[in-house]
Amino acid sequence: MKPLERAMKTLTLIMGLFLLAMIAQSSYAQQSPQPPTETIKTAASHTPEQQEVINLSNIKWDWMADKKVDSLETLFDDEAMFTHMGGTWGKTQELATIKSGGIWYKKAAVYAVDARIFGNTALLLEDIDLQAAVGEHEVTNPFMVTEVYIKENGKWMLTQLTFSHLLRPVKMNSNKN
């Protein structure tokens, strides 16, 4: 076999192996599962304590939409932390942001809620679409909201509120108010 023929066969073999590897990789990529679009379901029934926290959370969304910072001030623990897409801050800054309209929580559409009670701690997960005005821009985003409440002296206090952006599309019909 001449050197040129040997080089051509080697090159053909390498190209064939490369093509086979590309096909295998493409096939694997097409079989990869898509990320989940919904991770929680609302239970058919809740304990009275779970329902109390769910109701409190719903009232909180109304207070935020109506900018009722006096009501929110009594709900938020003094050491509470709020995690948004743009950063994390405490109670004072959250209330100031709501009062000034820096973030106006116009409407929260809650699609699913999971409430769990651990002693005097309540963990709430909510699958929501949030319509908000951020500065001069109105936006609607899908979030998984995590809320943590602590019961002190018979009263639930919000200690943590975190917005985690979801990959699913927005479900809310947005008719700008």
Where are these regions (language model features)?
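A cross-taxon signal for low-complexity, glycine/charged-rich
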Residues: 21, 29-30
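Bacterial N-terminal signal peptides
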Residues: 12-24
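Short stretches within intrinsically disordered, low-complexity N-terminal or propeptide regions
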Residues: 9, 23-26, 117, 124
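Bacterial N-terminal signal peptides that target proteins for export
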Residues: 2-15
